[in-house]
Amino acid sequence: MNEKSLRILEFYKVKDELKKYTNTNAAKDLVDNLKPYDNIHDVREHLEETEEALKLIISRGNPPFDGVYDVRQGVKMAQKGSILMPAQIFRIGAILKASRRFEKYIKAKGEGEGFRIIEDICQGIVLLKGLEDKIFISIESEDEISDRASSLLYNIRKSIRDKNASVRDKVNSLIRNYSSYLQDNLYTIRGDRYVLPVRAENKALVPGLVHDQSSSGSTLYIEPMALVNLNNEIKELKLKEKAEIDRILYELSKEIHDNIVVIKNNADIIWELDFIFAKAKFGSELNGNIPIVNDNCIIDIVEGRHPLIDRKTVVPMDVYMGKDFTCLVITGPNTGGKTVALKTMGLLHIMALSGLMIPARENSTVGFFTEIFADIGDEQSIEQNLSTFSSHMTNIINIINNSDEKSLILFDELGAGTDPTEGAALAVSILENLKDRGSMIVATTHYSELKAYALKSNGVENASVEFDVDTLKPTYKLMIGIPGKSNAFEISKRLGLPEFIIKAARENIASEALKFEDLIQSLQEKRIKAENYFREAEILKREAAKIKEKYEQKAIRLQEVRDKSITEAHRKAREIIRESKEEADRILKDIRELEKMGYSSSVKHELEERRKMLKDKLENVEENLYKAKSEDGQRLKSVKEGEEVFIPSLNQKVLVLSKPDNKGEVQVQAGIMKISVNLKELRAPKGSTKNTDKKLKREANLNLRSVATSVDLRGMDSIEAAYITDKYLDDAYVAGLKEVTIIHGKGTGILRSSITNMLKSHSHVKNYRIGEYGEGGTGVTIVELK
């Protein structure tokens, strides 16, 4: 892809932002080399690797890049067989450590997780744990060799510490002896040797070697003769220490050289991973998504935002083309909004084709273009001279000579810089030529001739950037299908141009042109209203979906509680049955004991009969426990819309809303809720025969439950209260209650109003009223049931 378009569309600024999320200079170099990939397979692969990195960050936290360095210089020296500096060895050890930790990071995946591309990259990591351990045992930091590097080094340093202690004892003794001759009662070190600060006039009184003097010459730094041998011994130990350190560095450098291929490979992998995860972090910061890339050059970007404009101020834009039209003409006043739309579209494509997430809604679609041409400049200047026109025409000629059906072409103020009539004619001809060869074109202009061209030409569509005449500013909302209006008269009027001048100007314009502009304004106003209605509908739709999801979850939880209660009741019933049987057996055993003791067998016979009757009755109850749920109504083979059926698991009648689908799922209305159940769970409603006595029907459905005469809704929201009330009224009706009390509290009256609205249409409610004095007043509603 041509470098000029990458520069004009500010892709380099995007890459500068991306670099902030890398850890190494090597990864920054990969960012510098980033540009759109040459084939769609590579684009999709690199987008997928970015998505995998984002999922890994979300599921496992940030990857282990701590302490990772750019070791290219050290690797290069090791390849030549050079002895490396401690810092270079330490950093290579950090790369080996990061490689090992990253392999562990990738392997620790959960069930069902898969990261194909990143796992494949990490397959190339070869662990060198032995060398890694040896490096970190030998080198504590970038400038310090550890005492543990070798036993010889440890012993040498111990000897140095001992000698230093001896020297300090000796020098402190000398300070006490020579204190009257010294500038200060302390020692210092010059060239690794202990010296005393002697006043110049006393140098003959302190025998020794002069190593230095102060800038004023008043102080001489003398090494007393008594310290010479001790200092010499320390110097010898220091030389031995250096020789041992050189040997250790040589051994480590040699081992690094022997494994340099593996080390370089591991380093390359870590830098590549650093680059990939930087893309994911950058995309996350943009609140971006992975776009869909298609080979048909279809564009459908939803709520796309320019990545370099502050998220708090940028206005999202929707743009689509490639199906019904391939040429989009954006018209309107010269306010900057059109250019932003143009740059946003081009830059988002470059980002997507470079494997980056784009700041747009999920499932936004971009086309795979092998070239993106951009002729964008500051064409909103008062001066439109020949040199400007020539410059743009040179760019346009280059575009015409190199574009094809895989090209996205962006023109800013096409045809500007020359006579408007000629410029408009040239613009139409250029667009027509590029459209015929299959290129995707987006052009901004303020020429009315191009609006007319877009209206009457196949494959060409008008668009405009919404402009607020009241504030004299663009809203930056792109409106496809509506041509832009120049708003010159309105803007001039707002800025204070006299009305008589504006009126005279209007008279100089043909009436057809004015009508055309007025029609455009009317279309814009209608479009804005329609979009507002659509947004409101979308908000309501999302809220309704949230409420539906909330109460479906509540229904599931209620059913779980209900099932658990039934199961627990069954368990307790079976426990009572078991204990009763055991008690009966114990009674029989006691009777036998009494019989052995001479008591009448008639007593035994009578009690045994009673025991048998108890056992039969208990067994019957136990059998009913297992049959109750499955035999609660006749199984249905089919249902129809509007039919009333019974769900045993809910112990509730429901209304069928749809026929069974291919999986046997039926949508039903249960109170205020719509739920899906399988046809197998539906039964014919109990007591459905017309001649069945109403009271008996209620008693049959009562199911031995005790229903309270009131329900307390205080503290609930309106929707939850309506659901609880609906269920309570069902239970109260089935239980045969004639009058119940709904406690909703006084508060703001919102809850009472919600309940009143529900009661108006409830099938079980005969009448209702606000509570009187002594009943709870306006804090309760008294309901009379049918």
From Swiss-Prot:
E.C. designation(s): 3.1.-.-, 3.6.4.-
GO biological process, one term: mismatch repair
InterPro entries on file: DNA_mismatch_repair_MutS_C, DNA_mismatch_repair_MutS_core, DNA_mismatch_repair_MutS_sf, MSSS, MutS, MutS2, P-loop_NTPase, Smr_dom
MF terms in GO: ATP binding; ATP hydrolysis activity; ATP-dependent DNA damage sensor activity; endonuclease activity; mismatched DNA binding; ribosomal large subunit binding; rRNA binding
PANTHER family, per the entry: OS10G0509000 PROTEIN, OS10G0509000 PROTEIN-RELATED
Protein purpose: Endonuclease that is involved in the suppression of homologous recombination and thus may have a key role in the control of bacterial genetic diversity. Acts as a ribosome collision sensor, splitting the ribosome into its 2 subunits. Detects stalled/collided 70S ribosomes which it binds and splits by an ATP-hydrolysis driven conformational change. Acts upstream of the ribosome quality control system (RQC), a ribosome-associated complex that mediates the extraction of incompletely synthesized nascent chains from stalled ribosomes and their subsequent degradation. Probably generates substrates for RQC.
Protein name according to UniProt: Endonuclease MutS2
Naturally occurring in which organism (per UniProt): Clostridium kluyveri (strain ATCC 8527 / DSM 555 / NBRC 12016 / NCIMB 10680 / K1)
